[in-house]
């Protein structure tokens, strides 16, 4: 335990927020065992099949988030409270549950999809912190992935200020990345717009809707008294080799953190999913086998070899049996992406045994 504590202390930046995006990504050995039992490609196939029959009540789910109305949920919370009392959990360490784990998170793109160029789209992401944005009843709230409300302000989102919140049904829920440097919420995805939920809609439609509706809200992309933070939609691009090369040669109005790859048919499902993949820009050449132009985005940092080696070893290990995979996961470590933003380490790891900055 002491060795583990020392390793964590040396690699994770200090933060009071659980799973803070100010901390580096978990190392490979923290990859959950349930993600080791099946290949990433197989889990993608199963999830696409599952979402065809899985129809959750997202209308009420979105309404609860917007109105902070959890009537009827108390019984389940009471059962959880009893379980926590039996486990003797410190009340001060319990997390807010209602707004926690509401964002769809990615996994490292390990198994390259055979239909990448046809069925996937890519979004270039800025350095920042993931945020759940809820605009309702004349106010806009920003929550962390862990469910903490970190800010309340007015915005020009539907339902986000007292002027445009004409009815209780005018609420909006967005998945964003907040850039403190640019004082901007970059919109990744839309879960609800003017009271209409989009959880069960495919990614390509959600993105189309988002980029159609955001420009209609005049002044949303400007910083004003009634809209103190800009809201800007992140563009998406095809995943063909030609498109990826063009994207990686572009200039962006923000510091680029990485690339999110979305399957076009993916519904918005809170939690980690293999239907959304994550790569740093310099990984595209090695992982996807795409020739990329030389430039700032594709320049490999000193620690790049360690990250790539772990991912490539994972791909090779999938030729082994399930038992060997599970053993290798605990030995060499395989991981899923719990954070989006990745701050730079002052002293990048130079040992394969050190924690990775991913």
UniProtKB/Swiss-Prot annotation:
User: PTM Phosphoserine: at which residues?
Assistant: 75, 351
Residue ranges of the region described as Interaction with m3G-cap structure? 128-130
- Necessary for interaction with KPNB1 and m3G-cap U1 and U5 snRNP import receptor activity: annotated span: 1-65
Q: Where is this region: Disordered?
A: 1-26, 69-90, 315-358
Cite a single GO BP annotation: RNA import into nucleus
Q: Region Necessary for binding to the m3G-cap structure: which residues?
A: 210-329
Q: Which residues carry this modification: N-acetylmethionine?
A: 1
Q: Where is the IBB domain?
A: 11-73
User: Which PANTHER family does the record match to this protein?
Assistant: SNURPORTIN-1 (PTHR13403:SF6), SNURPORTIN1 RNUT1 PROTEIN RNA, U TRANSPORTER 1 (PTHR13403)
Identification of the protein by name: Snurportin-1
Quote the gene name from the UniProt entry. Snupn
